Amino acid sequence: PDTKCVCCQDGKQCPCAGQECCITGKCCKDGASVCCGTCSNAACKCTGGCKCEGGCVCTEGNCTC
């Protein structure tokens, strides 16, 4: 099973396929595994300080993490 990490600011858990997302503070996006981290897409906006890395699909007021 995927390692559960509390990476989001809002306290939501996200699967991270065994990667150390909580230790590094960065997010991994590997297939269906998504964690929170710095968003590399300027068009992505998330409230609450939660941002998604890579091809993030966050919108204002919503975070897929």
Swiss-Prot record:
> What keywords appear on the UniProt entry?
Metal-binding, Metal-thiolate cluster
Entry-linked InterPro entries:
Metalthion_4_echinoid/annelid, Metalthion_4_echinoidea, Metalthion_dom_sf
Entry-linked SUPFAM superfamilies: Metallothionein
**What's the family?**
Belongs to the metallothionein superfamily. Type 4 family.
Protein name, UniProt field? Metallothionein
- Function description: Metallothioneins have a high content of cysteine residues that bind various heavy metals.
A Pfam family that this protein carries is Metallothio_6
Q: What GO MF annotations does this protein's record show?
A: metal ion binding
